[in-house]
């Protein structure tokens, strides 16, 4: 059991689109890892379920090794948002995530040139690993928000498949490009200032730009975390709902606004450190296979069977 816990922590720390990871040991104590001998590949099961499970809403596990019960669906179109890429069926989440997106979209609609938000991937109906794309987004507490300012919110289903967001980065993410606007900064500030938010992943140059421009209270910058990619969208991760057993939060970001750290990312993009010499005596890292249902929190077996 000890070896299993260590393996879970190490694998989760390497998951993509969910970096900056430090696990909460207290939360892990309430996550069941026993009672399942189901060795089916988890993404092949969770990725093909079309509807949410019964029962009250609840997240189990962590962003890159978990699932969700009682998920609700973000309506495909609302007064200030549209869900994109409907064919993926990834506009499901925990109720607080849906509420958060709707709240943020109402703020976005107050910004010049923005009718609201185009919302990218959230989670699958029962969370869990996906057939393609993200390693995270498994517990109903993650959402991708497009950088493209919506100029209309009556896109057809076909248009939502073909329309693409736009990149905000220049010089491999060291700087923002000419598409970046004060409205992007205002929306990100509002997104990060919400107490429901744990962190937001964004390319380094955008964080450095906001650090330069921020005035007054800068505490919200702490939640903006530099990470690879994330220039066509920003990735919001919410905290586990208060009092939820079985949901594992990451540790909070380090104290401070994180601006020096983001500048360090930029410096390394512009002046990459020399590669480390290969160790001829190093033991090759074994390849990790896809997650099995038996490797997810034990509650996920019930989630997939209900």
Residue ranges and their predicted role:
Residues 22-35, 39, 155-306:
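Catalytic cores and adjacent binding grooves of peptidoglycan-active enzymes
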């Amino acid at each position: 059991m000890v070896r299993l816990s260590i393996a879970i922590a190490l694998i989760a720390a390497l998951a993509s689109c969910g970096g900056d990871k430090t696990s909460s040991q207290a939360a892990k104590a309430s996550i069941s890892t026993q009672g399942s001998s189901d060795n089916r590949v988890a993404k092949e099961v969770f990725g093909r379920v079309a509807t949410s499970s019964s029962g009250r809403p609840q997240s189990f596990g962590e962003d890159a090794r978990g699932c969700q019960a009682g998920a609700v669906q973000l309506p495909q179109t609302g007064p200030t948002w549209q869900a994109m890429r409907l064919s993926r069926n990834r506009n499901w989440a925990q109720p607080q995530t849906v509420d958060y997106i709707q709240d943020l979209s109402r703020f976005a609609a107050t910004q010049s040139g923005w009718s609201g938000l185009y919302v990218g991937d959230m989670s699958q109906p029962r969370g869990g690993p996906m057939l393609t794309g993200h390693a995270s987004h498994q517990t109903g507490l993650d959402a991708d928000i497009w950088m493209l300012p919506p100029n209309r919110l009556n896109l057809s289903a076909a248009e939502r498949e073909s329309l693409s967001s736009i990149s905000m980065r220049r010089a491999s993410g060291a700087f923002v490009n000419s598409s970046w606007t004060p409205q992007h900064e205002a929306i990100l500030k509002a997104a990060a200032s919400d107490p429901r938010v744990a962190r937001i992943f964004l390319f380094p140059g955008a964080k450095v730009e906001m650090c330069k421009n921020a005035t007054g209270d800068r505490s919200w910058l702490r939640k903006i975390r530099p990470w690879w990619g994330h220039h066509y969208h920003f990735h919001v991760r919410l905290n586990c709902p208060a009092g939820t057993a079985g949901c594992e939060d990451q540790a909070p970001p380090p104290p401070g606004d994180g601006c020096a750290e983001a500048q360090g990312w930029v410096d390394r993009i512009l002046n990459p450190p020399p590669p480390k010499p290969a160790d001829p005596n190093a033991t090759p890292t074994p390849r990790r296979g896809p997650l099995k249902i038996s490797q997810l929190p034990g509650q996920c077996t019930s989630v997939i069977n209900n």
